[in-house]
């Protein structure tokens, strides 16, 4: 799973930016997140538990014309070969792409449609062995977005 996380970290590197001032770094570290990338334009952090691998990208992009959808499409087209695209859907909060890896694990790419901060886009890779159905997936998306948004000041 760690090898998959590394590949997915690279996949999230679509756009590059420095640790945003609107992120609560103390809270991130308190909740055991590791900083993966801290460059101007893109800030990536993640953590892995027994059940879930989570990688979050916070992007500061000036263009706002349907950028969340564009990011979601970029993740879909830029996925590694060992990640087979299964489906995509959207709910009121996010665009969600589902991938299945050769080892049977699932990766859910979650891109928030709206954020509290202008020009701030959130992209999440949620890796698990579970094959979520629509209602359950919506709950996971809401819970995950709520957690990530709680780190925004």
Please provide the spans of the model-predicted regions.
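Sec-dependent N-terminal signal peptides
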Residues: 4-14
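N-terminal "mature-domain start" segment
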Residues: 17-45, 80-82, 89, 144-149
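Surface-exposed amphipathic alpha-helical segments
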Residues: 29-33, 126-153
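Short, solvent-exposed coil/turn segments at beta-strand boundaries
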Residues: 30-31, 47-49, 90-92, 113-121
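Short, surface-exposed coil-to-beta transition loops
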Residues: 38-41, 53, 103-111, 120-121
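A short acidic-to-branched-hydrophobic micro-motif
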Residues: 45-70, 121-127
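Signature of long, low-cysteine stretches enriched in small and polar/charged residues
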Residues: 79-116
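Short, exposed beta-strand-loop hairpins at the edges of beta-sheets
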Residues: 99-104, 113-140
